[in-house]
Amino acid sequence: MIRRHLLVVLALWAAPGAAIAQDKGQVNVICSVQADWCGMIQTVFTRSTGIRVNLSMRGSGEALAQLTAERANPKTDLWFGGTGDPHLQAAEQDLTLEYRSPALGQLHVWAQQQAAQSRYRTVGIYSGPLGFGYNTELIARKKLPVPKRWADLLDPAYKGEIQVANPASSGTAYTMSATLGQLMGEEKAFEYLKALHKNISQYTRSGTGPIKAVARGETALSISFVHDGPTEAAQGFPVATITPDEGTGAEIGSMSIVKGARNLDNARRLYEWALTAQAQQFGAAARQFQLPSNKATPVDPRVPDFKRIRLIDYDYAKYGSAAERRRLIARWEKDVGALPR
């Protein structure tokens, strides 16, 4: 199915009779979206420009750790995707390069604000809300209610039935912790997380791991970005999603050029390409259903309808701070991660 989508997209991208471009060097990319989307970017960009894309797959937290470790000798040129908070933290730590794209005016306001907030060291490429994923067949078979609120997840009926990622490695889970802190206040949020721990079967490394486990029937529920639900449903899995009534946060998936990039010109070329409406269609073609940042990009009907979701006024500046991230993760590891299983 993905191969068929790729062939269609290639046909749309290439001019009639166009030949594959000649070799024009390379660009080294950390990719923090799902593998099918990363692979499509790699194939289409290489075929259309002649620039080889060398991919490294990392979750957002892992990507930030890699860039920090490589600060003195960067091996990465561009970081594509993943939650925006770590991109802001990379900008604050001078790991990424200031670059003002001439395409900024074509983007939604939230994508432009992400760029301005980082002093133009990152930019929004998509957005997606946080919520719950569930296996419809497993929920029915176990006679479990569908949760509608954050508070519902504390129901003892869900003991061992929920998966969520670890905020130290996953931007999804960090967004969850930050969202709860803003909804409840930090002290109540950590009391909530400690109570929720009793119902968690596993803390995964990757933010998409829990909803994939839901799809496979390994767990009934996940805390996930809700745009990941249609990805699994499109493959025939019995997955549905819901956003909590109390309110929820949303990520601004971002893209950054690494300071000290060895292939800077090619990184800028990929950056500009990724902001075009045409390139942003590859997300839906790869069955990834975030809201694209380019206003001219056609929106797939499976993309969550933000107008129907109660979104909090997420403080991207505060939770995009490197010090705040370190503090919150350290507290989570001490107060929640260290609890007995």
What is the predicted function of each stretch?
Residues 32-39, 75-218:
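Extracytoplasmic ligand-binding site segments that recognize negatively charged/polar headgroups
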Residues 85-89, 215, 220-238:
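A ligand-binding cleft/hinge motif common to bilobed small-molecule-binding domains
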Residues 97-105, 122-123, 151, 237-249, ...:
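Short beta-strand->loop
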Residues 128, 192-197, 201-204, 235-259, ...:
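Periplasmic-binding protein-like
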Residues 133-138, 178, 251-263, 282-283:
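A bilobed periplasmic-binding-protein/Venus flytrap-type ligand-binding module shared by bacterial periplasmic
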Residues 258-316:
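Mature extracytoplasmic/periplasmic domains
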